[in-house]
């Protein structure tokens, strides 16, 4: 898909300057109504002009104390990223591909890839260590008009990950995540586009752990949430896998000129099983989740001034069902019952507003402000445990661009603050339970209980002037402060070319 866009883009004559295309593709408006273009049938009017970007760089992160112990306290990653958006005749094509190779330091209490997605059903130990990674991602889509009113679109994406360690304990995780999306839109009158889309997904992860040191063998835990684990299967059951599926749908509305009202509503359901291979494919647990997301907003522009706002909300819930087994015969455990022990809910509602002034594609300045309320709660039935957290978040971004000859200089500064809202938790179990797997829970609970803030900047500088190519170097930096004294620095340096 990316190669098709590159060839076709250079086969046709360019009607606007390259700098003008970059101005359009980097408008602050783009993040405000981005959810509308999750429907592939709406992508035909996302941008007026084609633009491709090739980017390679280095990503570095280091924390004095990690935000979550399971994510490690820093990483070093090299990456290559290719992005394309192309109008070709009546069709619109887009694609993205990237490759990441690196390592994460001091990963603790987690030996499973895709932590956020599969939590709480992780495989863990108390040793951990440096974990190496390779990530691959491919996405491509198209939209095409059927007559004057109807437009169809489709998009597919695939993510593959490999994570491993060369010293005990040695995880070797392989994941495959395949998603497909089909959409349709109908033009009401001249400008009003109403659309719908359906999504399907297939997921699998092989999660295996090797232990070669027979003298010192750590206990392997199969976590079930809030510091609990499936006690019966503790020990050396180190081969597991996850498999599952997802389905969803969305409704979208927008004007083709991206003025006036826009809206999007989406629902997604996911079902993933955890299976312990070393116990004759024992189905330990099932994790179900559903996500509701909605956005409504208003945009205006006169070609020189762009402004607008949105109201955005999301609810993400998880339901964990554990299977109960009888006495094993020949290492086969008969399933005798199942029960829903774990539930969690994340909620967010917020608003976003922006203003940007563009002067004939020669310079631009603007800002974006966000305000949101975020809540999180999780509960385990037996033993009964419950934690709640909430925060109010605000952030501000100031953005500027200036054209120098045929090149473009871009920069922004941004910062944010989160006020923790104390909840009346019965968290006495955090100090009473002395098991090894309580430490990451205590750490995460402390993180959410305190205020945190961040600040950063992005600068992009062109290297030379060319007619059809715009090479650039980009520097991104962010500083995070949390847990009263902990801090984290993130730095990304990249070299790229737009064409």
Model-flagged regions — what are they?
Residues 64, 74-80, 132-138, 172-178, ...:
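Residues that define the transmembrane beta-barrel architecture of outer-membrane proteins
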Residues 16-19, 190, 487-499:
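Outer-membrane beta-barrel "beta-signal"
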Residues 228-367:
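Long, internal scaffold/assembly segments composed of regular secondary structure
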Residues 10-105:
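N-terminal, post-signal peptide beta-strand-biased segments of exported outer-membrane/organellar beta-barrel
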Residues 64-71, 106-112, 164-171, 207-213, ...:
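Outer-membrane beta-barrel translocator domains and adjoining extracellular loop/strand segments
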Residues 48-54, 89-95, 148-154, 190-194, ...:
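Outer-envelope beta-barrel architecture signal
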Residues 56-64, 99-103, 158-162, 200-204, ...:
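Transmembrane beta-strands of outer-membrane beta-barrel pores
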Residues 80-86, 138-144, 180-186, 249-255, ...:
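Residues on the lipid-exposed face of transmembrane beta-strands in outer-membrane beta-barrel proteins
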């Amino acid at each position: 898909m990316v190669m098709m866009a590159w060839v076709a883009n250079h086969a046709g004559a360019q009607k606007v300057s390259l700098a003008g295309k970059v101005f359009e593709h980097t408008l602050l408006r783009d993040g405000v109504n981005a959810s509308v273009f999750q429907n592939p049938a709406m992508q035909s009017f996302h941008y007026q002009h084609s633009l491709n970007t090739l980017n390679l760089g280095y990503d570095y992160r280091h924390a004095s104390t990690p935000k979550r112990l399971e994510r490690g306290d820093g990483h070093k990653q090299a990456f290559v990223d290719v992005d394309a958006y192309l109008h070709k005749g009546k069709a619109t094509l887009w694609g993205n591909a990237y490759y990441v190779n690196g390592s994460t330091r001091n990963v603790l209490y987690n030996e499973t890839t895709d932590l956020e997605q599969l939590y709480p059903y992780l495989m863990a130990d108390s040793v951990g260590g440096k974990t190496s990674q390779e990530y691959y991602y491919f996405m491509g889509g198209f939209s095409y008009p059927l007559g004057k009113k109807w437009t169809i679109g489709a998009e597919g994406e695939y993510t593959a990950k490999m994570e491993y360690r060369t010293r005990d304990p040695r995880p070797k995780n392989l994941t495959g995540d395949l998603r497909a999306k089909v959409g349709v839109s109908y033009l009401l009158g001249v400008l009003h586009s109403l659309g719908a889309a359906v999504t399907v997904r297939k997921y699998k992860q092989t999660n295996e752990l090797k232990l070669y040191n027979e003298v010192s063998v750590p206990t392997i835990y199969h976590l079930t949430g809030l510091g609990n684990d499936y006690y019966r299967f503790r020990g050396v059951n180190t081969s597991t896998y996850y498999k599952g599926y997802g389905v969803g749908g969305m409704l979208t509305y927008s004007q083709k000129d991206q003025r006036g009202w826009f809206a999007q509503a989406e629902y997604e359901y996911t079902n993933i099983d955890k299976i312990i291979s070393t116990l004759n494919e024992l189905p330990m647990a099932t994790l179900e989740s559903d996500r509701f997301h909605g956005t409504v907003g208003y945009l205006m522009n006169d070609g020189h001034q762009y402004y607008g706002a949105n109201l955005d909300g999301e609810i993400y819930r998880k339901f964990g069902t554990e299977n109960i087994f009888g006495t094993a015969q020949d290492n086969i455990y008969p399933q005798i019952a199942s029960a829903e022990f774990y539930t969690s809910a994340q909620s967010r509602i917020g608003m976003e507003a922006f203003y940007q002034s563009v002067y004939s594609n020669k310079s631009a300045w603007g800002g974006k402000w966000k305000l949101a309320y975020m809540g999180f709660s999780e509960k385990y039935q037996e033993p009964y445990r419950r934690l709640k957290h909430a925060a109010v978040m605000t952030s501000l971004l100031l953005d500027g661009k200036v054209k120098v000859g045929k090149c473009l200089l871009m920069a922004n500064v941004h910062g944010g603050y989160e006020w923790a809202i104390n909840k009346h938790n019965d968290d006495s179990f955090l100090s009473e339970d002395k098991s090894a797997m309580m430490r990451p829970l205590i750490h995460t609970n402390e993180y959410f209980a305190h205020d945190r803030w961040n600040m950063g900047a992005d600068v992009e500088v062109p290297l030379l002037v060319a007619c059809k190519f715009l090479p650039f170097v980009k520097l991104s930096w962010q500083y995070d402060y949390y847990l009263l004294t902990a801090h984290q620095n993130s730095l990304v340096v990249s070299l790229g070319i737009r064409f």
